[in-house]
């Protein structure tokens, strides 16, 4: 019992008072913390793990900015400036993810096992991503597509944590292109809404609040925002943020010009067709799911 109180005190000092995140470059450290601390000191139902998929799931298609060869960057500068001024540039990440032209490689090969290990311990685990819900090019509903894509191609499945509430449309939040943020099979798709704001709305909708919220993200901004929103909503929840900082990327400098130009052309041809959605009944038939 004394050891448990010491552990909780240490977490309070490092995670709340100093407002610092635990920086890691792989999932092994997080898994170790679960084995040594969280599982021993909390019941599974008292925990919630949230994985921010945006920067930790797949290797970047292109090298990060500081890794780009200066000569290559100089040649690409005019094209990059045009992209930055194009209002459709917000869809680039989703375009890369959904296009068959680009091979997707896991940034951490242990990611599927990490999710499975947490799930097999009966600890609730969900994911959040910055994608846009609804129709996207030839995909009827992106939020359904990403859940099915991850399960089919990488054996990554978040659907078991809240099986009775596997579909929610957050139409109390701001709409974007006639769509709203959605929770589908364990994945929150934020749809141009802050991931932290969406998480709080998720807690309200589910009438659920963990004693400990453990978030893994490649964005310090999201971690800080989540901590601040959580503190305003409930002071009784312990927030533990893991900043996943893995700089691994593909060496594609030689193909930069081809890839950027191809992305530009695809971006200009993006099509979305979304009628307004008006339902927010978690128990109703899913109007997105056309599989039946």
Curated annotation (Swiss-Prot):
Domain of life assignment: Bacteria
Signal peptide interval: 1-19
InterPro entries named among the record's database cross-references: DUF2608
Residue ranges of the region described as Disordered: 271-292
Keywords noted in UniProt: Signal
Full protein name: Uncharacterized protein RBE_0637
Provenance organism: Rickettsia bellii (strain RML369-C)
């Amino acid at each position: 019992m004394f050891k448990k109180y010491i552990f909780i005190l240490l977490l309070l000092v490092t995670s709340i008072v100093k407002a610092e995140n635990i920086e890691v470059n792989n999932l092994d450290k997080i898994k170790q913390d679960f084995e040594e601390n969280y599982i021993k000191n909390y019941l599974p139902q008292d925990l919630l793990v949230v994985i921010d998929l945006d920067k930790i799931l797949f290797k970047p298609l292109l090298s990060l900015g500081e890794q780009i060869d200066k000569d290559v960057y100089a040649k690409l500068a005019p094209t990059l400036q045009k992209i930055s001024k194009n209002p459709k540039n917000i869809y680039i990440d989703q375009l890369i993810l959904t296009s068959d032209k680009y091979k997707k490689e896991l940034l951490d090969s242990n990611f599927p096992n990490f999710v499975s290990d947490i799930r097999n311990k009966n600890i609730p685990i969900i994911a959040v991503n910055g994608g846009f819900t609804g129709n996207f090019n030839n995909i009827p509903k992106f939020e359904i597509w990403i859940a099915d894509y991850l399960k089919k191609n990488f054996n990554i499945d978040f659907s078991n944590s809240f099986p009775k509430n596997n579909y929610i449309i957050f139409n109390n939040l701001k709409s974007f292109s006639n769509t709203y943020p959605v929770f589908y099979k364990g994945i929150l798709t934020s749809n141009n809404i802050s991931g932290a704001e969406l998480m709080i709305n998720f807690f309200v909708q589910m009438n659920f609040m963990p004693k400990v919220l453990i978030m893994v993200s490649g964005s310090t901004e999201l971690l800080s925002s989540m901590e601040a929103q959580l503190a305003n909503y409930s002071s009784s929840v312990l927030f533990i943020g893991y900043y996943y900082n893995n700089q691994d990327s593909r060496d594609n400098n030689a193909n930069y010009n081809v890839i950027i130009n191809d992305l530009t052309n695809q971006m200009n041809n993006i099509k979305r067709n979304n009628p307004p959605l008006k339902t927010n009944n978690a128990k109703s038939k899913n109007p997105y799911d056309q599989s039946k």
